[in-house]
């Protein structure tokens, strides 16, 4: 017996990366998972090196970032890798979620896989938000103030939670220090969740574009899919390098190069681009508590999909109505992202409210209605 099968630890690697049977029909959308793993490794590695030189004292935070950029050997490179790595992490994550929505990867028997994936998404957003606050530029300070203030909308306990998080009466030194501690801890929790995600995936294996269970026609992970993954890894590294070396601040905000000043409010307060769709949903609801519920509900509503999608057939590859509504939903999500960075004024307010209504209607009304209608058509077709 080869050592990769007989050794206790290597046998785990073997069962996941070498002999793992994969459907022969999976396409390049299934490669995004490996890119997410690469992004997580890049973020943890670059983050550890940045933490060696970063100071979480509010008086020194901004200057310590500038010290990394100017005085530390290759500090500018590590900082830009970490900053752009966060953006690319979310690009890959949104692609991964989009693939799952299109191909029905959330349906039974992969519900646990989907639930863990949504938890990973939530933890990643929390980690990214706290990391953005650590730079302590203008947008960091005011972003931290606005987002943490949202918790004051929670009935009865909200007014007490906000000072508890701040460690005072405003965003101050204790806030940045606890954000730094949590920002350092959460990626390792993310890594543990990713291991759980892989374990859940290993139980039933990957789905496929056809939406059928193809246990007969499978290929080993190595060499076929390992080399296929390497193709997208090299393409990813090429595009990532173009941003890091030639356009490192494109995905950032210029106001964050101004030191945080609680006495000067920026013309518009916007979070990083990957949080904008949910920020637009928050702003589209006039009531503060309603907006907070809508924003968190917009993320957690992903958990309802395994139950609201009643279709017999997994995925949208052969379903015209579902495919059309999915691409309409995709356009709507991109529209929300654009509205999140615009000023709160007419006509963007009304447009944001319509887009928010469609976002929730897709999960709660459109998916159940269309899946039920397609089931009837499927039943009529098979009877004939």
Swiss-Prot record:
GO terms for biological process: mitochondrial electron transport, ubiquinol to cytochrome c. It is found in: Mitochondrion inner membrane. It comes from Candida parapsilosis. It comes from the Eukaryota. Keywords: Electron transport, Heme, Iron, Membrane, Metal-binding, Mitochondrion, Mitochondrion inner membrane, Respiratory chain, Transmembrane, Transmembrane helix, Transport, Ubiquinone. Heme 1 (or BL or b562) is low-potential and absorbs at about 562 nm, and heme 2 (or BH or b566) is high-potential and absorbs at about 566 nm. Its main location: mitochondrion. GO terms for molecular function: metal ion binding; ubiquinol-cytochrome-c reductase activity. Binds 2 heme b groups non-covalently. Heme b b562 binds at residues 82, 183. CDD domains: cytochrome_b_C (cd00290), Cytochrome_b_N (cd00284). A ubiquinone binds at residue 202. Component of the ubiquinol-cytochrome c reductase complex (complex III or cytochrome b-c1 complex) that is part of the mitochondrial respiratory chain. The b-c1 complex mediates electron transfer from ubiquinol to cytochrome c. Contributes to the generation of a proton gradient across the mitochondrial membrane that is then used for ATP synthesis. Belongs to the cytochrome b family. Its cofactor is heme b. The chain crosses the membrane at residues 32-52, 76-98, 113-133, 179-199, 225-245, 289-309, 321-341, 348-368. Fungal cytochrome b-c1 complex contains 10 subunits; 3 respiratory subunits, 2 core proteins and 5 low-molecular weight proteins. Cytochrome b-c1 complex is a homodimer. Heme b b566 binds at residues 96, 197. This is Cytochrome b. It is a multi-pass membrane protein. One of its GO terms (cellular component) is mitochondrial inner membrane. PANTHER family: CYTOCHROME B.
């Amino acid at each position: 017996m080869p050592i990769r099968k007989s050794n206790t630890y290597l046998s785990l690697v073997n069962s996941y990366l070498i002999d793992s049977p994969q459907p022969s029909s999976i396409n390049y959308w299934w490669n995004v998972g490996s890119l997410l793993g690469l992004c997580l490794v890049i973020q943890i590695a670059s983050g550890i090196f940045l933490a060696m030189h970063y100071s979480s004292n509010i008086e020194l935070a901004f200057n310590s970032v500038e010290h990394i950029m100017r005085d530390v050997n290759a500090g500018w490179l590590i900082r830009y890798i970490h900053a752009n790595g966060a953006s690319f992490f979310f690009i890959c994550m949104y692609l991964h979620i989009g693939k799952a929505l299109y191909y029905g990867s959330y349906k039974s028997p992969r519900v646990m896989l989907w639930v863990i994936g949504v938890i990973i998404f939530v933890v990643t957003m929390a980690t990214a938000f706290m990391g953005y606050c650590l730079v302590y530029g203008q947008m960091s300070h005011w972003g931290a103030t606005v987002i943490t203030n949202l918790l004051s909308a929670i009935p009865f306990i909200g007014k007490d939670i906000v000072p508890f998080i701040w460690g005072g009466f405003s965003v101050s030194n204790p806030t940045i220090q606890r954000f730094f501690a949590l920002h350092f801890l959460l990626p390792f929790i993310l890594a543990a969740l990713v291991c759980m995600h892989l374990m859940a995936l290993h139980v039933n294996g990957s789905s496929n574009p056809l939406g059928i269970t193809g246990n007969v026609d499978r290929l080993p992970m190595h060499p076929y899919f390992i080399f296929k993954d390497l193709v997208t890894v090299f393409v990813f590294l090429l595009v990532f390098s173009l941003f890091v070396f030639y356009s490192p601040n494109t995905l950032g905000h210029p106001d964050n190069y101004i030191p945080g000043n609680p006495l000067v409010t920026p013309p518009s307060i916007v979070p990083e681009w990957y949080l904008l769709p949910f920020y637009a949903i928050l702003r589209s609801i006039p009531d503060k508590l309603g907006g907070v519920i809508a924003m968190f509900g917009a993320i957690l509503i992903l958990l309802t999909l395994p139950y609201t999608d009643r279709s017999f057939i997994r995925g949208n590859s052969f379903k015209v109505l579902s495919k059309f509504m999915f691409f309409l939903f995709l356009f709507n999500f991109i529209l929300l992202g654009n509205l999140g960075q615009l000023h709160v004024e007419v006509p963007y307010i009304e447009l944001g409210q319509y887009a928010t209504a469609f976002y929730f209607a897709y999960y709660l009304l459109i998916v159940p209605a269309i899946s039920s209608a397609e089931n009837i058509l499927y039943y009529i077709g098979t009877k004939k």
